[in-house]
Regions:
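Catalytic Walker B motif of ABC-type/P-loop ATPase nucleotide-binding domains
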Residues: 126-130
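A short, surface-exposed alpha-helical micro-motif characterized by mixed small hydrophobic
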Residues: 168-170
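Conserved ABC ATPase signature
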Residues: 101-105
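Conserved ABC ATPase "signature" region
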Residues: 64-97, 145-148
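Conserved catalytic motifs of ABC-family nucleotide-binding domains
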Residues: 122
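Conserved ABC transporter NBD signature motif
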Residues: 10-18, 31
Length: 218
């Protein structure tokens, strides 16, 4: 979807009625599709607030004459954007670090910053690639809380790719399970948990409630 890999010959990728197969990232973002990668890609030497503001660039509506004669209009718009981005940083718990460089954040904080930048694009669909990878149990719980609030606060549809079962089971309404690239189950978390194909592929056996609780723990 992001253009890193080409689709199979003869196929294409459609989002919200638009063919985005060969579109550049800024056009895909402007259509309302945002994503995070497992490998973090931040501007390490830029401040936290500027990293988040970089995600808003597709929404900025400067015109040529504004830059020439409308400086106050630009300044007012930039202040509005910065205020909105500070509210977003507060939402993910990073407001106190706004003026620090991204390189000064911990690994868990950087993941939250990447998430905030993706939200700043105001997407219709937000795709998260293993958002909990490498996080401590406390940070995983915090991330899950934020994900649950995202759906209500920003009206987002989310697609989450994640290997930590607890995150999947506690945050997703619908779960799709793949085994070696093939879909083997789809349904609610409770339906998928009891699916024989899923049990065989991922758990190896039928589990009682206590064993399942331990398996779902981080």
């Amino acid at each position: 979807v992001s253009g890193v890999y080409d689709p199979d010959p003869g196929s294409y990728i459609e989002f919200d009625g638009h063919d985005i197969t060969n579109e550049p990232p800024h056009k895909i973002g402007a259509l309302g599709l945002s994503r995070t990668f497992q490998l973090l890609r931040l501007y390490q030497d830029m401040s936290v607030i500027n990293n988040v503001m970089s995600g808003y660039h597709t929404r900025v509506k400067y015109k040529f004459f504004d830059a020439v004669i409308g400086r106050k209009k630009i300044w007012d718009q930039e202040k509005e954007i910065k205020d909105e981005m500070m509210e977003l940083l507060s939402f993910v718990g990073l407001a106190d670090y706004a003026e620090l460089n991204a390189s000064e954040l911990s690994g868990g904080q950087r993941r939250l910053l990447v998430l905030a930048r993706a939200i700043a694009m105001k997407p219709k669909l937000l795709m998260l690639d293993e958002p909990a990878a490498g996080l401590s149990p406390v940070n995983v719980d915090n991330l899950m809380k934020i994900i649950m609030q995202l759906k209500d606060k920003y009206g987002l549809t989310l697609i989450i790719i994640e290997h930590i079962l607890k995150v999947v089971m506690d945050t997703c309404n619908t779960v799709t399970v793949l085994d070696h690239g093939q879909k083997i189950a789809e349904g609610t978390p409770s339906q998928v948990k009891d699916d024989n194909a899923v049990i065989e592929a991922y758990l190896g056996k039928k589990m009682n409630d206590e064993e399942m609780r331990k398996a779902l723990a981080v």
